[in-house]
Swiss-Prot record:
Molecular function GO labels: protein serine/threonine kinase inhibitor activity; RNA binding
UniProt region (PABPN1-binding), positions on chain: 223-230
Segments carrying motif Nuclear export signal: 137-146
Chain intervals for the UniProt region annotation (Disordered): 205-230
UniProt region (CPSF4-binding), positions on chain: 180-215
Domain notes: The dsRNA-binding region is required for suppression of RNA silencing.
Position of the signal peptide: none
Subunit architecture: Homodimer. Interacts with host TRIM25 (via coiled coil); this interaction specifically inhibits TRIM25 multimerization and TRIM25-mediated RIGI CARD ubiquitination. Interacts with human EIF2AK2/PKR, CPSF4, IVNS1ABP and PABPN1.
Swiss-Prot/TrEMBL GO biological process terms: symbiont-mediated suppression of host cytoplasmic pattern recognition receptor signaling pathway via inhibition of RIG-I activity; symbiont-mediated suppression of host gene expression; symbiont-mediated suppression of host mRNA processing; symbiont-mediated suppression of host PKR/eIFalpha signaling; symbiont-mediated suppression of host type I interferon-mediated signaling pathway
Modification note: Upon interferon induction, ISGylated via host HERC5; this results in the impairment of NS1 interaction with RNA targets due to its inability to form homodimers and to interact with host EIF2AK2/PKR.
Name this polypeptide is given: Non-structural protein 1
Ranges spanned by the short sequence motif Nuclear localization signal, renumbered to the chain: 34-38
UniProt xrefs under Pfam families: Flu_NS1
């Protein structure tokens, strides 16, 4: 096993522990708490994949961080912070909408890279809006936290979420996953719209209905892909 992989996991475990202590003092805002919860799932998946105990890794990560801080000057810290571009966290959904449980009558699921696409194929003839919470850097989607499909009545009928055991995805990965979700939902004559935030940072183009322009041929192909591969 690569030593950098192990040490990276150890540092991530310790930093998560620090953030958890911060949250326990009721100091974290909603985006902070959301990332904390999802990073916990990711660390559990990575720990299982690597065969490493999280508690032991956390202690080792503390030693690594302490050693770095001992060598770090205030001036170097200022330069590092100034040179790192800041990302923004954008929210279409409330914390309640993100954490709400939902159920599928005819479940369909597809894994595309490090993203999991889920949808209820029993939904027909509905107006559906895609909403997402994600981070943006350089005016492009950086990391998808969660995307969900809502009917006008507020029911959740689809979802795209990162797999905890496979961290890392690009904006193109997200765009392709959204295309698969839209294709599957439109197969049952649903009308799908994309939120303005997603249009701006993930699609960069849309038609008058507020959804990405997908040719009918491509739409049918993606819908068949969902049915054949799930």
């Amino acid at each position: 096993m690569d030593s950098n992989t192990v040490s990276s996991f150890q540092v991530d475990c310790f930093l998560w522990h620090v953030r958890k202590r911060f949250a326990d003092q009721e100091l974290g805002d909603a985006p902070f708490l959301d990332r904390l919860r999802r990073d916990q799932k990711s660390l559990r998946g990575r720990g299982s994949t690597l065969g490493l105990d999280i508690e032991t890794a956390t202690r080792a990560g503390k030693q690594i961080v302490e050693r770095i801080l001992e060598e770090e000057s205030d001036e170097a810290l200022k330069m590092t912070i100034a040179s790192v571009p800041a990302s923004r966290y954008l929210t279409d959904m409330t914390l309640e909408e993100m954490s709400r449980d939902w159920f599928m009558l005819m479940p369909k699921q597809k894994v595309a890279g490090s993203l999991c696409i889920r949808m209820d194929q029993a939904i027909m003839d509905k107006n559906i809006t895609l909403k997402a919470n994600f981070s943006v850097i350089f005016d492009r989607l950086e990391t998808l936290i969660l995307l969900r499909a809502f009917t006008d009545e507020g029911a959740i009928v689809g979802e795209i979420s990162p797999l905890p055991s496979l961290p890392g995805h690009t904006d193109e990965d997200v765009k392709n996953a959204i295309g698969v979700l839209i294709g599957g939902l439109e197969w049952n004559d649903n009308t799908v719209r994309v939120s303005e935030t997603l249009q701006r940072f993930a699609w960069r183009s849309s038609n008058e209905d507020g959804r990405p322009p997908l040719p009918p041929k491509q739409k049918r192909k993606m819908a068949r892909t969902v049915e054949s591969e799930v």
